[in-house]
A protein has these predicted regions:
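N-terminal secretory signal peptides
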Residues: 1-23
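C-terminal auxiliary extensions adjacent to catalytic cores
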Residues: 56, 444-489
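FAD-site-proximal beta/loop scaffold in flavoenzymes
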Residues: 175-222, 339-405, 415
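Internal hydrophobic alpha-helix adjacent to the cofactor/substrate pocket in enzyme cavities
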Residues: 403-427
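FAD-binding core/adjacent interface of flavoenzyme oxidoreductases
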Residues: 18-34, 41-57, 130-245, 252-258, ...
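A Rossmann-like FAD-binding core segment of flavoenzymes
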Residues: 82, 124-136, 251-367
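Beta1-alpha1 glycine-rich phosphate/pyrophosphate-binding loop at the start
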Residues: 2-10, 48-128, 234-278
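Extended hydrophobic secondary-structure segments that form protein cores and membrane-embedded regions
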Residues: 86-90, 227-233, 264-272, 341, ...
Length: 489
C-alpha cells in the first residue's frame, strides 16, 4: 500500500465536495475534523511513531496476521531497538480489507480485488512470517505447537487470531461447517447456490451477494411481492452493525429501482434491542420506521430449509411464574417457540466464536474467548500473554475502529512488561461503527463501556451525514491499509 492510494482517495473526496460547492477545508471544519490531519492528508501518521524506541529484549510471538496482528507487529517493530517478532498466520491474504464487504455486497465496490491484499506486502521490516497454524498452547512452558508439528517457544505472546464463522451450527448449513471472512468460500457458495441466501461475512460470498441482490431486485421490478429477511445471532459478532447495514443498502438499491413497494424487509435479532447504546438504538428505530423496515427481537436463526426457502427461528422470552412467598418474588420462566418464516432473500449473520484450538486451550476461557483485563489487554492468568481484536474477551466492540485504539495500548503495556514494569496504559472500550443507512449517508456511532455516545466531533452523532459517507467509502480503507498496518495510525 502506497501513499498514492491516499492521494487517490482525497482526489475523489475533493471531487465530490466540489460538486456540492464545498471545499475540503470547509467540509472537514464543518465535520469537526480540523485536527484530524490524517483525514485531511496531513502528517498525523508520521507524527504518531514512537519518539524513543525501547531497548527491551524478548522473543515475541503473534498468533494471527490480520489487521490486529500485523498492526501490532508493525508498531512493536517501530517501538523496539532490536525487535524479535514472529507472526503465525496460515492465510496468505489475511490482511484483506474486511470493512469493505458491505460495500462490495451492495455494488459500491465493483470487485473483491478492491479488498484482497497479500499479507507479505504489509509485513513489517524485520518481522518473520510463518505460514502455519497454531494448534496447541502450553503457556506454562511458553511453547506453541503448529499444525506442521513444529514447536515454537516465546517470551511474550500476543493472540490476535480473530473469529470463526460457525455456519455449521445452523441446521441445514452443516455442510458449510466453519469458515473465515478471508477464507475459502467454496462450501458457502455451493450450499447457498442461487437460493437468495447470502452473507456479507465472507469476502467471496459478499461479492456473490451483489449478484443475488440484483436478481432479487429484478424480480421485484417485475411486480412480484417478495420478502427479504436479515438475521443477527445469539453470539458476539465482528462488526455488529453489518446485519443492519446490508438491510439499509438493499432498501436503498430497491428504492433506486423503484421496486421498494413490492418488498417486505424484516430484521430478526436474537437480542432485545437494535443497538447496545440507547441513543443509537432510538435513532435506528426512527430510521427503520421512516423506511418501513420491520424488526423482531428475541429471534435466533437455528435452521434454514433451503429447498422450501424457510428460515427457522427459536423465539425466546420470559414470563412470570408462581409467586415465591419466601423470596417475595415471582419465579421467572423461560419460554421458547419455533417460528418458521418464508423468504425470497435471506441474509445470514452466522454465529461466531474463537477457533476451538485457541478458545478451548489453556489460554482460553469457559466461554471460548481469550480472558484479558479489559483495560490493559493482559491475560488474566499469564502476565506474558496479551490479546486484542475479535478474539479478546472484552465487554463490547469487535471492529477495526476498536483495534485502532487497542493495539497502541497493548504495545505500550507489553513493552512495560518487557522492561519489568506494570502495564500503565488503559483501553477505555472505544468502538466506532460507521453505520451505513443509505447510499450517501452514514451515522457515525461512537461509544465506549459507558454505553453512551462518545463523539469525536462536535456534531449530533445520531444523525445520518453525507460527510461520514465520504469518510467510510473513500478514506477509511487507505487509513486502514496504509496507516494502521504500518503501525502508525
Amino acid at each position: 500500500m502506497k501513499n498514492d492510494e491516499m492521494k487517490k482517495a482525497l482526489e475523489v473526496v475533493n471531487s465530490e465536495l466540489k460538486k456540492a460547492g464545498i471545499s475540503r477545508r470547509d467540509a472537514f471544519k464543518l465535520a469537526g475534523l480540523g485536527g484530524a490531519a490524517f483525514l485531511a492528508g496531513g502528517t498525523e501518521v508520521k507524527a504518531s511513531t514512537v519518539a524513543k524506541a525501547s531497548e527491551a529484549k524478548g522473543k515475541i510471538l503473534i498468533i494471527g496476521g490480520g489487521l490486529a496482528g500485523i498492526s501490532t507487529a508493525a508498531r512493536l517493530a517501530n517501538s523496539l531497538t532490536d525487535p524479535d517478532i514472529t507472526v503465525i498466520e496460515p492465510n496468505p491474504k489475511s490482511v484483506s480489507y474486511q470493512a469493505g464487504t458491505t460495500l462490495l455486497a451492495s455494488g459500491i465496490y465493483s470487485s473483491k480485488d478492491e479488498l484482497v491484499y497479500e499479507t507479505k506486502d504489509f509485513l513489517p521490516k524485520g518481522v518473520t512470517l510463518i505460514k502455519d497454524k497454531a494448534v496447541d498452547f502450553n503457556p506454562e512452558a511458553n511453547k506453541v505447537t503448529l499444525a506442521s508439528g513444529d514447536i515454537l517457544d516465546y517470551d511474550f505472546m500476543i493472540v490476535a487470531a480473530g473469529v470463526v464463522l460457525d455456519f455449521g451450527a445452523i441446521k441445514g448449513l452443516e455442510e458449510i461447517g466453519e469458515a473465515y471472512t478471508n477464507g475459502d468460500a467454496s462450501k458457502i457458495l455451493k450450499v447457498f447456490g442461487n437460493s437468495g441466501i447470502t452473507s456479507v461475512y465472507n469476502i467471496d460470498s459478499a461479492e456473490d451477494m451483489w449478484k443475488q441482490t440484483q436478481a432479487f431486485i429484478e424480480r421485484a421490478k417485475s411486480g412480484e411481492k417478495l420478502k427479504a429477511i436479515f438475521t443477527a445471532p445469539n453470539t458476539a459478532v465482528k462488526c455488529g452493525g453489518a446485519p443492519k447495514k446490508v438491510m439499509y443498502l438493499v432498501n436503498s438499491r430497491l428504492n433506486e429501482a423503484n421496486a421498494r413497494g413490492n418488498v417486505d424487509l424484516t430484521y430478526y435479532d436474537n437480542s432485545d434491542k437494535l443497538f447496545s447504546v440507547k441513543e443509537y438504538a432510538d435513532a435506528i428505530e426512527k430510521q427503520f420506521i421512516a423506511r418501513d423496515m420491520k424488526w423482531n427481537f428475541n429471534h435466533n436463526l437455528v435452521g434454514v430449509d433451503i429447498s422450501k426457502k424457510i428460515a427457522i427461528f427459536n423465539k425466546h422470552w420470559e414470563e412470570k411464574g408462581e409467586y415465591d412467598k419466601d423470596l417475595e418474588e415471582h419465579e421467572i420462566v423461560k419460554k421458547n417457540q419455533k417460528v418458521e418464516v418464508p423468504f425470497d432473500f435471506l441474509h445470514i449473520t452466522p454465529p461466531q466464536k474463537a477457533p476451538d484450538e485457541i478458545g478451548k486451550s489453556e489460554i482460553g476461557s469457559d466461554k471460548g474467548w481469550i480472558p484479558v483485563n479489559k483495560e490493559t489487554l493482559q491475560h488474566v492468568k499469564y502476565s506474558n500473554i496479551f490479546a486484542l481484536g475479535d478474539i479478546a474477551a472484552v465487554p463490547m466492540g469487535k471492529t477495526g475502529g476498536t483495534v485502532r485504539k487497542q493495539y497502541k495500548v497493548l504495545v505500550d503495556n507489553l513493552i512495560s512488561v518487557m522492561e519489568g514494569k506494570e502495564p500503565k496504559e488503559y483501553f477505555g472500550g472505544y468502538t466506532v461503527c460507521p453505520l451505513i443507512t443509505d447510499i450517501g449517508k452514514v451515522m457515525l456511532a461512537e461509544f465506549d463501556w459507558t454505553a453512551k455516545p462518545t463523539p469525536s466531533f462536535p456534531l449530533d452523532p445520531t444523525q445520518e451525514r453525507w460527510i461520514w459517507w465520504l469518510m467510510k467509502v473513500y478514506m477509511l480503507k487507505p487509513m486502514t491499509m496504509h496507516g494502521m498496518l504500518s503501525g502508525k495510525a
